[in-house]
Amino acid sequence: MIDLAPLVRRLAGTPLADWANGLQAQLDTKMAKGHGDLQRWQSALDALPDLQPERIDLIDSFTLEAECNGETRTVLRKALLGLSPWRKGPFNVFGVHIDTEWRSDWKWSRVSPHLDLKGKRVLDVGCGNGYYQWRMLGAGADSVIGVDPNWLFFCQFQAMQRYLPDLPAWHLPFALEDLPANLEGFDTVFSMGVLYHRKSPIDHLLALKDCLVKGGELVMETLVVPGDVHQVLVPEDRYAQMRNVWFLPSVPALELWMRRAGFTDVRCVDVSHTTVDEQRSTEWMRFQSLSDYLDPTDHSKTVEGLPAPMRAVIVGRKP
């Protein structure tokens, strides 16, 4: 059982206290329904060796260090491989380097210089396995709650939390829709890699705004296309082999959407093309990756002939 009592204590006296008090029952109900692979992933978690970090770095990377002999490291590596595929990272766990599909540290190095997370209560929507949550703590956040309904990501987070039990980061296997309306309790809300999966992007922006305190900041990272304020791509079918991609706006169009949703001080802080060095297959993620989704003769296009992935980070404030 996951004990959320520390989370309840952390949020006592905040606008999120009432919500926090009901989370244990909500989580227990969700876990009772389970998932077909949960037992296998739980076995991998149970196989993790008992280790105590002597040095923790969440500022420049995710690195845990301690005295660890070769035999223990082999057990650790096997257990962590049992939680494959690993999408977001990398993680260096007592000398075991989890070489994830994404170099998420590169994205964080593009995003983090534009933010001040010191002392902030943070919500990460679509948090994946929680890599960014740990880095947010490294950047000074007071607490970080991630929501993502994917059970494997939940278990991968538990693996890291096993070695960092006292840090104020929590992963809830919920969708944004499972959160109550008008929470208005977070100083900063992240939505990275989610918007293009939403059939109604404006509703997504409004739901994110509802999670923020007045004056709170939204960090929106999503796929974009070149063009002016009128340019929005809606794929006929797939985009980079993904079925569930709906709206890819230009940066000016996305900025307009955010203003229409009620955000102020809207600005783009980064635009970057995703490369096959940043997203690729590895031993820890053996399935197809970006190189399989691009036109083999022209990497400026996807296999469908659409513009290759380009990502923007837009920040805005709730007035």
Curated annotation (Swiss-Prot):
GO biological process: tRNA wobble uridine modification
Family matches, as Gene3D superfamilies: Vaccinia Virus protein VP39 (3.40.50.150)
EC number: 2.5.1.-
Residue positions binding carboxy-S-adenosyl-L-methionine: K88, W102, K107, G126, L176, E177, M192, Y196, R311
Matching InterPro entries: CmoB (IPR010017), Mo5U34_MeTrfas-like (IPR027555), SAM-dependent_MTases_sf (IPR029063)
Family according to the record: Belongs to the class I-like SAM-binding methyltransferase superfamily. CmoB family.
One Pfam family hit: Methyltransf_9
Keyword Transmembrane helix carried by entry: no
Enzyme class: transferase
Catalytic activity, reaction form: carboxy-S-adenosyl-L-methionine + 5-hydroxyuridine(34) in tRNA = 5-carboxymethoxyuridine(34) in tRNA + S-adenosyl-L-homocysteine + H(+)
GO molecular function: methyltransferase activity; transferase activity, transferring alkyl or aryl (other than methyl) groups
ATP-binding among keywords: no
Domain of life, per lineage: Bacteria
Keyword entries, A-Z: Transferase, tRNA processing
Name of the featured protein: tRNA U34 carboxymethyltransferase
Natural source organism: Pseudomonas syringae pv. syringae (strain B728a)
